[in-house]
């Protein structure tokens, strides 16, 4: 999903054949939507059928199936402090993935049935093979190829988090599982939203020719302001300029480290720096990239077990559009040193600022996700 976009026949054509397309149809693929390849005039792909936050599922696995508010969202599994091996980690993660993918499928299939009953799309069906021959609309499975494609993100963050545990707890043994868990539970000694904005001073002005920027006029913020409060101030300014009476507020409550001593904060921050300095996905390091691959394949293999009401297969995708930013707010601190509520990695790209060996190394890491 980068700029410029790159599409590779040597990867796409075999992938489509693996999905049941004939070789001729696979060779005739085109890119629709954002980046999705499909055979034109023969496919009802329903791409972007859902967004699936892999990092949130791993977050839930860390807490034994519970959300940050203590509510049991998934199956009861061993929480992170009870993981005695990588097998324990993967058992908890895979169990939660299985559960939440099943809920994704239930929701998508319900929508699919609603599409069939409420929006049969007869005109579009007349243009898609073989709806007329089968006597079915595309919503009933009239197309030759039928898919449902949910999109995942947070798989790179999850892979990096898994590698940090593997390296520091089970290999180097310089940190314990409990140490990492306690530091995460206190957001590494920082208040919620820390790490999102740490510049000394920012002034948004009308120098830009963009209309939205001009409408902002100027909003001054200090280094003590969180990103949420900065965004809130800017949006409120724009709304006021446009005469809108719409109000907007962003919850900027601090939920972390309210009971930390200075010594605890320093210790949690020390742990975060160790985790953050750990080798990361995107630098063509096999042992790191294989953790991201495993995290991704657990999700994708589970998705591909299911069929949709049109008789087609579920197929997993991995890109977020921009949901990695918004949905990062639902994910607590992770074992890779990421602060609570911070944005997640952009699709299968490395985490922001953690690819240090150039674009070819990043490309090599991405290529390992599905070998």
Q: Regions from the language model: what does each represent?
A:
Residues 1-222, 229-231, 240-371:
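Conserved catalytic cores of very large enzyme subunits
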């Amino acid at each position: 999903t980068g700029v410029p976009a790159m599409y590779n026949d040597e990867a796409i054509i075999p992938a489509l054949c693996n999905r049941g397309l004939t070789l001729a149809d696979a060779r005739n693929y085109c890119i629709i939507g954002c980046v999705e390849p499909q055979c034109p005039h023969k496919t009802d792909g329903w791409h972007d059928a859902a967004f699936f936050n892999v990092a949130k599922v791993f977050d839930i696995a860390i807490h034994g199936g519970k959300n940050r508010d203590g509510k049991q969202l998934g199956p009861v599994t061993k929480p992170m402090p009870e993981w005695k091996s990588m097998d324990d980690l993967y058992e908890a993660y895979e169990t939660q993935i299985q559960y939440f993918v099943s809920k994704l499928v239930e929701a998508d299939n319900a929508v699919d049935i609603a599409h069939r009953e409420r929006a049969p799309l007869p005109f579009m069906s007349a243009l898609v093979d073989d709806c007329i021959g089968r006597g079915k609309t595309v919503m009933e499975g009239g197309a030759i190829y039928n898919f449902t494609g949910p999109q995942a993100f947070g798989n790179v963050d999850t892979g990096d988090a898994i590698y940090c545990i593997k390296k520091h707890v089970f290999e180097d043994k310089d940190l314990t599982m409990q140490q990492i868990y306690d530091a995460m539970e206190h957001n590494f000694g920082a208040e919620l939203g820390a790490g999102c904005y740490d510049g000394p001073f920012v002034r948004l002005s009308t120098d830009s020719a963009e209309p939205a920027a001009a409408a902002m006029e100027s909003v001054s913020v200090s280094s003590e302001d969180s990103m949420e409060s900065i965004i809130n101030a800017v949006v409120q300014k724009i709304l006021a300029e446009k005469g809108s009476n719409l109000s907007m507020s962003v919850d900027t409550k601090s939920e972390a480290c309210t009971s930390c001593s200075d010594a605890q904060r320093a210790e949690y921050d020390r742990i975060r720096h160790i985790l953050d300095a750990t080798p990361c996905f995107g630098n063509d390091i096999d042992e790191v990239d294989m953790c991201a691959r495993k995290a991704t394949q657990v999700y994708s293999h589970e998705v591909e077990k299911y069929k949709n009401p049109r008789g087609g297969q579920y197929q997993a995708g991995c890109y977020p559009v921009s949901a990695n930013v918004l949905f990062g707010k639902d994910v607590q601190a992770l074992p890779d040193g990421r602060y609570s509520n911070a944005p997640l990695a952009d699709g299968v790209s490395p985490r922001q600022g953690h690819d240090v060996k150039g674009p070819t190394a990043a490309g090599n890491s991405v290529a390992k996700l599905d070998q």
